[in-house]
Amino acid sequence: MGMSFSHLLIVLLIIFVLFGAGKLPQVMSDLAKGLKAFKNGMQDDGSDNDKNK
């Protein structure tokens, strides 16, 4: 019950319409930075637990 290619295209089209061509690169950049910070935070949290053992 995953997303098919047509569903993915529809979602991308909606995002493009909502944010427009001008803002889309900035939105994607901010999203990537947020995901990277989240991933780093999860790794830091895991290493803190290892130190406490």
From Swiss-Prot:
It is a single-pass membrane protein. Keywords: Cell inner membrane, Cell membrane, Membrane, Protein transport, Translocation, Transmembrane, Transmembrane helix, Transport. Part of the twin-arginine translocation (Tat) system that transports large folded proteins containing a characteristic twin-arginine motif in their signal peptide across membranes. TatA could form the protein-conducting channel of the Tat system. The Tat system comprises two distinct complexes: a TatABC complex, containing multiple copies of TatA, TatB and TatC subunits, and a separate TatA complex, containing only TatA subunits. Substrates initially bind to the TatABC complex, which probably triggers association of the separate TatA complex to form the active translocon. It is found in: Cell inner membrane. It comes from Rickettsia akari (strain Hartford). Pfam families: TatA_B_E. GO terms for molecular function: protein transmembrane transporter activity. One of its GO terms (cellular component) is TAT protein transport complex. Belongs to the TatA/E family. It comes from the Bacteria. This is Sec-independent protein translocase protein TatA. The keyword Membrane applies. Signal peptide: none annotated. The lineage of its organism: Bacteria, Pseudomonadati, Pseudomonadota, Alphaproteobacteria, Rickettsiales. The chain crosses the membrane at residues 1-21. GO terms for biological process: protein transport by the Tat complex.
